[in-house]
Every structure is written in structure tokens, then in C-alpha cells.
């Protein structure tokens, strides 16, 4: 059985790692290079960086962050936020990223997924999706995709499950499924959404949005059928360590990559 992955998520704003609730009310969580090095030593399986401002004036800061992080860590690094063209992908990969994550740009231009996969390989292309429940209580579950998440989230009218299937057909090699309803709440992932998508696609699905305790990660891997779990606040602010979470999951029968202890 393949090992499951624990992936700290670092949202970067103006060169600092921040974390908010439902994309707002950000708290400073530290220096991205220092945090990345810490997680590398702590047994994280991968790291994800999102440039949450994603404006042109921040782009050079993010490239510099990626370059500095790539010198410090020896685990896969995914970078997203403001990647709108194949040239943007190339710039981040050249800076040291192993994968690039696209979200809004893929909705606006789905061809970007196919173009990126053809040039760099599907293993480099991660599709990140922000989804929100739209069904009324008592009705069948349904989720729609949103873009420009933050202060001005915009509904796309795209069904989350159908969008997931389409982007995989276009060449996305992994999916990050973020629940807008759960993001930053610490109340657990939307496992129904994760399971619905996991059963429809043949690529790894990464759970995002809602981690508050190790039991939530376990539920995402079991009930949500996720291949990996993304988490931020529980790690950034010292609530739990990566090592402690991996030990808990391993004790629950989840196959994990264990970090060798120094002799």
C-alpha cells in the first residue's frame, strides 16, 4: 500500500507566511524559509506554498522565496498563486519548485492544464480547487467551484466533481480539494466532497481546509479516501508536530513514511 503524505501548507503574503479563517483575518506565522527548513527536518513529506496576494508586484518576492526554500529543503515543493501562463510555470520550476499549482487560471483557460502537462509532464501539474456546498439541507450534496477566493469569491457555476474529472482528462497529475466551508475552522475536512471526487478520478487527491486535530486527518484519509492531507494552522502555531501526527496515523494503521531518528 502506498504511504500517505502529510503536507504543511504555507500561504505567503509579502514574503511572510500567514494563516487566516475562510481566507480572511490573517495571522503572521513566520518566515517561509525558516518554516520550510523546520518542516523538512520534522518529517513533512512535501511542502505547498501559495502566493495569496498573487499580484505582479509580489511575483519577484515569491520567486526569491522559492529559490531560498529550494536550497534548504530536500522534499518535493509545490508552488501556486498567480500562475497564469506556461512561462509562469517555467519560472517557478526553474526557481526550484517540483510542481506548480493552478486554480483560477485553469478555470479561465483550461487549455493551460494541457499545455503545462505537455511541456513539463502531468506529474508537475497540480489543480487546486476551492469548492463550496450549494445544496439546501435535505437535498443531494452538491458543490460548486469558486475562483478569486478571499474577499471577493466568485462562483463559476462549475460542478466540483465534473470539473475534477475534466481537469484530469486535460492532464492534471494531482488535485488539491479545498473546502471553502471548512477552511481555517479547525472543524475537519469535507470528507463527503473528498470521497465523491476520489472515486471519480485516477490521480492522487489531496485534502485541504479544516484540519484541527489528528483525528481530522485520519478521517480524510479513511472516509474521504484522500491520498494526502494538507494542513496549516495545526502545524504553524505549534498545536501539533508533523512527527506526532504521523505517529498517531501510523498507530491507526495508515502507512506513513517515517523519519529516521539521529543516532
From Swiss-Prot:
Query: Which residue positions are annotated as catalytic?
Result: 11, 130
Q: Give the EC number(s) under which this enzyme is classified.
A: 4.3.2.10
Q: Which GO terms describe its biological process?
A: L-histidine biosynthetic process
InterPro entries, per database record: Aldolase_TIM, His_biosynth, HisF, IGPS_HisA/HisF, RibuloseP-bd_barrel
Subunit structure as annotated in this protein's UniProt entry:
Heterodimer of HisH and HisF.
Summarizing the function annotation, the protein's role is:
IGPS catalyzes the conversion of PRFAR and glutamine to IGP, AICAR and glutamate. The HisF subunit catalyzes the cyclization activity that produces IGP and AICAR from PRFAR using the ammonia provided by the HisH subunit.
Family recorded in the similarity comment: Belongs to the HisA/HisF family.
Which protein, by its recorded name, is this?
A: Imidazole glycerol phosphate synthase subunit HisF
| Species, as recorded | Herpetosiphon aurantiacus (strain ATCC 23779 / DSM 785 / 114-95)
Organism phylogeny: Bacteria, Bacillati, Chloroflexota, Chloroflexia, Herpetosiphonales
